[in-house]
Amino acid sequence: MSAFAHGTTGRARGVGVFFKKDANIEICQEELYQFIKFKTEDITIFCLYVSKGCDFGKLVQSLWNYEFNNKNENTYLIGDLNFDAPGNNYLSHFLSRSEFKQMVSRATHLDGHILDHIYVQEARSNLIEIKHHHVYYSDHDGILVSVKKEDIL
């Protein structure tokens, strides 16, 4: 069985996730950012959409409020962050200090920027495979993230 959760605050803003019904879902909806925390017994994924003009300090505080970077969890942060990686802002510095590594290494947007990010705990970065694929319905690439099974046991 599967279900769908979404967080959105307007046209062309928001995030959606398909998930197994046994997953725990929490949604944060602010005007300039939205995220869904998707958690199973094996993995925790934060799926984000960040609008231009976002207060990254406020976003980081929201991530903390939703227990981002619990060292006991296998945590990933993915999404359209609307800044070119590697970035030089409060969020990118927070993730670096928290020992997360940005895994996307080539442009994901038609303008030639890396706007879609995947952050993984550095200790698990060798267990992740990233594949880009072009989609006809978006100006962003589709990104497939594969996690090696031994990482979630």
Predicted regions and their residues:
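Conserved active-site segment immediately N-terminal to the catalytic lysine
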Residues: 1-3, 102-103
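Generic preference for hydrophobic
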Residues: 2-3, 45, 119
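RNase H-like two-metal-ion nuclease catalytic core shared by retroviral integrases
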Residues: 9-15, 107-117, 139-141
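Active-site regions of metal-assisted phosphoester/phosphodiester hydrolases
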Residues: 17-108, 124-153
